């Protein structure tokens, strides 16, 4: 599956996910102060694997416990702003995090989930990162991606 097909599959994912972030009191509380004194955007890079032929790159513009916007980036598209953190792993590792409902920090410590950028910031806001992961796991697009396709 290439980017164009992923985009069709995603439907209203970006709006729905952003709305769910903004409606989460748990995330809002855990992310209080995020992006206020520093750039708050992050990117999840889910490396192509199995049937998914293009990387899935999700840009999240976050500030002070709120979502300002989310974008599913095309393969060579630059993010609107330089993210402070990029979380990178193959799709099958992201799937494993979701299905095991594991704390992302365990995957970071084992080196299976790589962090590029300001590591200390993400560690300081680890509860917010965990809440964001929980919210992402409930999104229809990601559920379909992780369950309906062979990720290798």
Label every PLM stretch briefly.
Residues 1-152:
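Feature captures hydrophobic
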């Amino acid at each position: 599956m290439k980017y164009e097909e992923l985009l069709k599959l995603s439907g209203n994912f970006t709006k729905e996910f952003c709305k769910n972030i903004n409606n989460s009191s748990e995330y809002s509380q855990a992310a209080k102060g995020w992006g206020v004194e520093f750039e708050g955007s992050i990117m999840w890079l889910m490396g192509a694997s199995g049937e998914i032929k293009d990387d899935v790159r999700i840009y999240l513009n976050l500030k002070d416990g709120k979502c300002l916007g989310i974008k599913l980036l095309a393969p060579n598209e630059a993010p609107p702003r330089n993210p402070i953190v990029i979380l990178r792993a193959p799709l099958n590792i992201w799937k494993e995090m979701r299905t095991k409902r594991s704390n992302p920090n365990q995957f970071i410590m084992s080196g299976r989930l790589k962090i590029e950028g300001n590591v200390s910031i993400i560690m300081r806001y680890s509860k917010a990162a965990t809440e964001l992961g929980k919210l992402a796991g409930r999104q229809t697009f990601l559920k379909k991606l992780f369950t309906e396709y062979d990720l290798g």
